[in-house]
Each structure stands twice: as C-alpha cells, then as structure tokens.
Swiss-Prot record:
Cleaves substrates with C-terminal arginine residues. Modulates the Wnt signaling pathway, probably by cleaving some undefined protein. Regulates the development of skeletal elements during development, probably by activating WNT4. The keyword Mitochondrion does not apply. This is Carboxypeptidase Z. GO terms for cellular component: extracellular space. It comes from Gallus gallus (Chicken).
Length: 647
C-alpha cells in the first residue's frame, strides 16, 4: 500500500512541475520543449507568401520548430530553387506543394493536411522532370506520409492554379491527336516529353543518351524505327542534330515538333511517315548544347544577341572543336592511291581542349553506321555542304569541293528546294544573297573554318552531313515558331528520304558469312565507304553509271557496273560475294601508315556518361555529384543526400 501511494504522489508532482526554462538562444533555434499549446501564426516564409492561406503552425510535419529552422533547411532551399533547376517546369505547383508541408495550413489552432490526390497527380506529371536532371523525388513530398485523403478533411494547395496546364503535352485525352504546342521548351520539358513519347509508342520509338554535357545534362536522342534500339540489316541510319550552338534554338524546336509529327502521322496511317519509319532508323538529337541553351534562355527570346549561349559551359564552340581532318585530306589529295576517307584522329588533337559533348558525338558516330545527317543552325537561310575548310587557309572564301561534290549538291538542294523561303527567288529577303546559287553553297566558299562537324563526318566515317541555316533569327519569339515549322516541315522529310538514294547491299564470303569493314569503292570518286558489322553497306550516289568495287583483306576484289536512272528514288541492291585468297606472311605485316594512330585513341576509353564539371575541393566524391549539387553548397551539415538517386 505504501509503495503505491508513493508512486501516485510522484506522478502528481511531475504533472504539476513547471516546464524547464529555455537557455539563451534555444528558443530561436526551435529547441525549447515547452508545455505551451501550439497556435496558428502568420506565414513569414518568403517563398510561401503566395499560398492560399495566411497562417501556419510550428512545428511543421518535419518537426521543424520555427521559421528560422525551416529557412536554413535543405528542404526549403530546394523549393526556393526548383524553378531554376527544372527551368520552370511544374512550377509554381511544386513550390506550393512543398510549402503545404513546410508551412501547413492552420485554422483555429489546428493543422490541416494537404490532399493526397493533389500530390499524386503532380508526382505523376513531374517525376520525369526530376529524372531529367538525375534527381530523386523529395522525401518530404511523400504522398502517403505527409498528405491526407479528402474524407479526412484535407485542403488543395493548388486551388488557385486550377484551369492551368501544369506540364506541356499533358492534355485531356479527348484533345485532337494532331494538337501541337508551339513554344520554347526548357531542357527538362524536352527530356520529359521525349521519354513520354517513347513510353507511349514503344513499338516505334525509344530514347537514349549519347553522353553528358560539361554540366552533367544528358544528351538525349529519340529514335524511330520498327525495331527501336537495334540496327536492322540493310536499313539505313539517319540523324538530325539541333542546338549545337546554344543560342540557335530553332533547330531544337523543329526536331521537338518533328518527333510529335512522326508519332501522330505514323499512328494515323500517313503513308509518307510510315514508309520513312518502316524503312529507316531515324535518330533525333534536339540539343547538343543544353548548357549553352540555358544561358541563352536567360536572355530571353527576341532579346538574345549573336553570342550569349553560343558556346558550351567550357566556353568552347562545338562546331570548331572537332579534329581537323580536312587539312590531312588536302595533303593526301595529291598522292596517288591515297585514301580520302576514314582518316584517323591525330594524336595532337588530344593535346587540346576537347569538350565532352564533342567526344560524345564522335563516339556516337562510331557506334552506329550513319549514312546521312544534317545539323540545324540559325542566323541565315541557306544549306551548306563540305568542305567547310578552304584548301588555302589564307583564302577565306574559296570553293573547296569534296570528291562527292555532285552528291552533296544534290543533298543540299533536296532541303533547299522543299523550303518555300529558301527556294524563293526574291533577293529582298533573309538569305537573299544565296538566291543565284539556289539557296545552297559550298561551306568554304561562304566562309572558311576548321574543326567543323560536317567535315569530320565525311572524312572519319561513312556519313554525309550538311549544315542547314533554318532562319535569320537565332532565338525567335514563340509566335514565330508555327510559321518556321511550316516552312521547314516538308524540307525535313524530303532530306530524310535522301538516305535511300544510291546503292546498298551485303558483302559476304562464299558461305554467306558477312564481311565487316570491307571497302566499297567507286571509280572516279576518291572516297570509299566500309561495310557495317553485318556486312551491309549504303553508298549515296547521284544518277549515273558507275564501276563499283568491293574488297577486303584476304579476299578477291569484285567489280560491278551499276546504272542509276534519274527517276530512281530507292537505293539499288548490289551484293558482293568475295572469295578468299592466300596471303603471304610478309604481306600480313604491312599496315597502312595511318593505322598507327590507332595505338593512341582516347575516344575508345572515353565514358560519355561520366560527370565532367570540376567542383570545389577537388575530391573524387565531390566531382561525382550532379551539377545541381552546388545549389546546396551553403549547407555545411545536413546536405540533401536524399536527392541523390544512388543514395
């Protein structure tokens, strides 16, 4: 009986004991444990002043006990910078949703949770935007943990935004299938939509990254074919590249829209689009320079000059950053029997500053047997073709043709003639200086420069590439994009169809085994192409009669006469069967001199998906963090490791 009475008295004493006094400084840090009942207080967080309510309560759902604690937290910093990180996508929606957790609504001294369905809908629409920048979904936006169902009396933190479309292309299901929004798209919006397109049409589309920019942004490609992700025998590979210069944004938006057209028209049964996708593997890289684009976008459409954002984050012009193989081609041109194709990258090139974007594209070119390509630029209305570097460097404007001059002119005209403005004969318009040339010009004859991507394509790979200046404004206003698209629509399709000109075939031995890297030569054209891994090849040729030779180490040489009629618009099939021959040992030791470059080729070891930006401190662990990690550099402790996907 006595022990029970003592326990009762002790309990009563503790119940009536005053709360411990706060030490100096503890109250402002939210560290006081008081018995005072929490009350509603006015919201004073600068990033949450536009919420639909006026009062909140501390501690919040994260047990942060004061305004000061919240403002110094990584969660609050995140919602404050989300607009910049996601380039405007899903904002202010995400910020308001975050505010509903960090500063929840308070009425009559009672906290009200935000609605779970609002969180779930926003996560569904915006998760891909986080994926695009390699960021995990924030833990404090866990829809099950910090949100409530409508039956529990929740509130909608996005009520005032109702009626607005939060995410591009997230439109009602009954919207017309042909609806397209013509606007400038941020990097995250672009990546999000590419992934959505591939997900919804996985039978004809897929996305992949060829590498990362200097600041860590993935260089995303969307591919269209009947077997996405795989090379198919005798099906040619085509690529479009946009936004090589960050401030030249029209090419990026054209490819963004072309992606939509390819999907819509294919599903609606359009014969032209279906024929293209069924017979071609198409790769669209909308933005090769996303870092530069960000800087240009900060200036704004219509206000951007000719410099801001043109270069990469390393201050490199990507169209001057490729190996100079053109000088080597000029040196070889006078040598009897010398080859002007598949010229190796010289060792001296790697001594300079090579952008990760450049390395990624070069490795991409090696991994896929591209046949035809175009790079979309802005600032003029003209189509240029190699060589871009003059035979005599001191002569800025000199006609400098490749051995495939006729074919390149045919390719350039295929785009120019299908473009209503480029083909317009009026000299009083943008691009009027090129009217007498039919809207096309040899690159070096316009102006000479070295290190260009088009010359590298031609001299290092099998691929033919032209450069298309798609408009006189580099960063036009959004209302101009609709007109620009309609001017370029048919030209884009017409040029893609040119990948089916010339001849194609398979080189094999007498047993039907494919022969890789066999050479296909055309008499009178000092430029060979080689067979792919499956022994298939594609040789772009204009109409005419040719003597075509196939040869490979250890096999006989086979020649065939080929005639391509003027009206022939499909590649002619020309197969070769090579017979083995005996090779003397001393001949096996002979190797072309240029093969010595293969002893040092950093491109083979280059990981295009590695992070490249150098961070403070220099430690390997810091350098591997994503580009957006620097936004949280002010936090000495409690850095948001929960935002790292690998954490």
């Amino acid at each position: 009986m006595v022990p029970s009475l003592l326990l009762l008295l002790t309990g009563l004493f503790r119940a009536t004991e005053p709360a411990p006094r706060c030490e100096t400084g503890q109250e402002t840090l939210g560290q006081c444990q008081t018995a005072q009942k929490a009350k509603c207080v006015d919201i004073s967080l600068s990033s949450c002043t536009d919420v639909t309510y006026t009062q909140t309560m501390y501690p919040n759902f994260l047990d942060q006990k004061s305004r000061e604690v919240i403002e110094y937290s990584s969660e609050y910093i995140l919602i404050s910078v989300l607009h910049n990180l996601l380039q405007g996508e899903c904002n202010p929606d995400l910020r308001l949703l975050g505010c509903s957790v960090l500063a929840p609504q308070c009425e009559k001294d009672k906290v009200i949770k935000p609605c779970r369905h609002v969180c779930e809908n926003l996560k569904k629409n915006c998760l891909s935007a986080f994926d695009a920048i390699d960021m995990a979904w924030p833990y404090f936006l866990d829809c099950d943990r910090f949100f409530a169902g409508e039956e529990e009396g929740c509130f909608d933190p996005l009520a005032k935004l109702r009626g607005e479309v939060a995410v591009e292309e997230d439109l009602p299901s009954d919207f017309p299938a042909t609806f397209i929004q013509f606007k400038h798209h941020s990097y995250s919006q672009m990546v999000s939509t590419l992934k959505k397109t591939a997900s919804r049409c996985s039978h004809i589309a897929t996305t992949y990254s060829i590498g990362r920019s200097f600041e860590g942004k993935d260089l995303f490609v969307i591919e269209f074919s009947t077997k996405p992700g795989h090379h198919e025998l005798l099906k040619p590979e085509f690529k479009y590249i946009g936004n090589m210069h960050g401030n030249e944004v029209v090419g990026k938006e054209l490819l963004y829209t072309l992606r939509s057209i390819c999907v819509q028209k294919y599903l609606l049964g359009n014969p032209r689009i279906q024929t293209l996708i069924n017979n071609t593997r198409i790769h669209l890289l909308p933005s090769l320079n996303p870092d530069g684009y960000e800087r240009a976008a900060e200036e704004g459409a219509g206000y951007n000059g000719w410099v801001i954002g043109r270069q990469t984050a390393q201050n490199l012009d990507l169209n001057r950053n490729f190996p100079d193989l053109t000088s080597e081609a000029y040196r070889r041109a006078g040598i009897r029997g010398a080859r002007l194709d598949h010229i190796p990258i010289p060792q001296s090139y790697w001594w300079g500053k090579v952008a990760p974007e450049t390395k990624a594209v070069m490795k991409w070119m090696r991994s896929i047997p591209f046949v035809l390509s175009a790079s979309l630029h802005g600032g003029e209305l003209v189509v240029t073709y190699p060589y871009d570097y003059s035979r005599h460097p001191m002569e800025e404007k000199e006609f400098s043709p490749t051995p495939d001059e006729k074919m390149f002119k045919m390719l350039a005209k295929a785009y120019a003639d299908a473009h209503p403005v480029i083909s317009d004969r009026s000299e009083h318009r943008c691009g009027g200086n090129f009217v007498k040339r039919g809207g096309i010009i040899n690159g070096a004859e316009w102006y000479s420069f070295t290190g260009g991507m088009a010359d590298f394509n031609y001299l290092h790979t099998n691929c033919f590439e032209v450069t298309v200046e798609v408009g006189c404004e580099k960063f036009p206003l959004e209302e101009e994009l609709f007109t620009i698209w309609h001017e370029n629509r048919d030209a884009l399709l017409n040029y893609m169809e040119m990948v089916h000109r010339g001849i194609k075939g398979i080189v094999s031995d007498k047993f039907g085994n494919p022969i890789k890297n066999a050479r296909i030569s055309v008499r009178g054209i000092q430029h060979d192409i080689t067979t792919a891994a499956d022994g298939d090849y594609w040789r772009l040729l204009p109409p005419g009669t040719y003597i075509v030779t196939a040869q490979a180490m250890g096999y006989t040489k086979v020649m065939k006469r080929v005639t391509l009629p003027i009206k022939m618009k499909r590649a002619g099939r020309v197969d070769f069967v090579l017979r083995p021959i005996e090779i003397w040992p001393n001949k096996l030791l002979r190797r072309p001199m240029e093969d010595m470059y293969d002893q040092y080729d950093p491109l083979e070891l280059f990981d295009p998906h590695a992070q490249h930006a150098q961070a403070r401190g220099g430690s390997q662990q810091v350098r591997e963090k994503p580009w957006w990690w620097s936004y949280f550099s002010s936090l000495d402790l409690h850095k948001p490791l929960w935002l790292l996907k690998q954490h």
